[in-house]
Structure formats: C-alpha cells, structure tokens
Amino acid sequence: MIRTLLLSALVAGALSCGYPTYEVQHDVSRVVGGQEASPNSWPWQVSLQYLSSGKWHHTCGGSLVANNWVLTAAHCISNSRTYRVLLGRHSLSTSESGSLAVQVSKLVVHEKWNAQKLSNGNDIALVKLASPVALTSKIQTACLPPAGTILPNNYPCYVTGWGRLQTNGATPDVLQQGRLLVVDYATCSSASWWGSSVKTNMVCAGGDGVTSSCNGDSGGPLNCQASNGQWQVHGIVSFGSTLGCNYPRKPSVFTRVSNYIDWINSVIAKN
C-alpha cells in the first residue's frame, strides 16, 4: 500500500514535477507550420527512437513520468524493434550538454489496445528505461492529472513534438510546440466533427484548420496548465485526419491520460 501511494504521488501530482526550470514560451501558434519551442521548456518530453541499419531514427514522442518510465502511445510500439529514449534534448541531431540516450528494458502496451480498431482507444503504453535517470533542469518528470479529470471546452493546452511541419512535409530538427484549445466530447463526437470515431477515453484539441499535431508527434504530450501553474500531461497524441494534419473540424485526438491513472500506477508497481 505504501509503495502504491508513493508511486501515485510520483506520477500523478508530486510538487517536483510540472514546473519547468526554463520558461515556456506562450502563444506560439503551431506545430504544423514550424514554431520552435524554447529549449528545455518541456523537460519531460522525450524522443522514442528505433534502430535500423545501424542508425537511430525518431519515431514518436513520449513523456517521462518517473525516473525510469516513459508514457507514450501503443501504436508507437513494435516488439520487433529495438528502442532507445533521448531525454533532455532540443535538437535531435546535436549531442547537447545535459541530454541522455538510454536503452529500453521493457515495453508494456495496454492489454485492450487493438491496432486494427484505433477508434476503440486504449492507445497507451509504458516504456521502462534500462536504468533510472537523474533529474535535472533539462530532464524532469511530467505531472499527470487527477483520475477522471475532464477539461472544459476551449481550455488552452500545448502539443509538443518533432513531427512533420505540415501534411507530408519535412520533419524539424528542433522541438516544436503548438497551442490547441480543447474541444469537448459533445462537439468532437458530433457528425460534422469526428462522429463515433471519438470515445470518452479520448481528448480532442484543435480543429481550427491551422494548428495541429502531425506525423511524428504521436505518443507525445498534450500539456495543460493547472490553476496553480503546474503543467500536467492530459493527453497522448493518438490520431488525426487522413485528409490532412490540420483539417478543419478534425482536431487532433489524444488518449485521455486521466482515464488511465490506475493502469499507469499498476504497471509501474508490478514492474
């Protein structure tokens, strides 16, 4: 019981998490379109990379939720691949001071995830690092919201990642961020938006035809600031429209983290 309570504090609300040392640059317009985040202002953001032909390649984002666990999307994970995690990094091509590359020892995909039925949800996975990392000004853990939290319509959040700058476009070398407004479930699940593809275990944000996540942002965080100034990861980038990354009334869809707090704590406690 004590161990469970300690884990809950660590991944769901410890005061040491969610307060970046380096200030977040507010009101940056878009990930699609290529607006650079302030270096190390999202210190829980990681790059999940796979090995191919002797080289490492960025495939997805993720969030450090404990000193040896990363939260990402289930669709990012393949058991046939070898992965590593880059932490404390702004530029993917530069060996920056204070950054780390850590091997992966375990992959845990949600047991109800079905790659053939993305709209069912449960697009969530945990990646265990081969060794714990020391927390610094450039590498910090994310805070997760209280279980069951539902953000109101038009709540401002930021999506971050190294995904494409536009539909079928180039990928950036440095971390991008984009401000998105939450779209409530009633709106997002309406016929002219996402319809039945969206479930209550998801969060929608964006849909204005300008700002969105894109390919390569998958698994990364939807960062939303609480009234006390603490940043919390409310979403995991899951899917977008095949019509384009920033298609009107097709907001970015995220796994709703607050629906999975018990699952996250359970996986970490058992592993």
From Swiss-Prot:
It is an enzyme of class 3 (hydrolase). PROSITE patterns: TRYPSIN_DOM (PS50240), TRYPSIN_HIS (PS00134), TRYPSIN_SER (PS00135). Residues 31-269 form the Peptidase S1 domain. One of its GO terms (cellular component) is keratohyalin granule. It holds the Pfam family Trypsin. Residues 1-16 form the signal peptide. Disulfide bonds join 60-76, 157-224, 188-204, 214-245. Elastase that enhances insulin signaling and might have a physiologic role in cellular glucose metabolism. Circulates in plasma and reduces platelet hyperactivation, triggers both insulin secretion and degradation, and increases insulin sensitivity. Interacts with CPA1. Interacts with SERPINA1. Belongs to the peptidase S1 family. Elastase subfamily. This is Chymotrypsin-like elastase family member 2A. It comes from Rattus norvegicus.
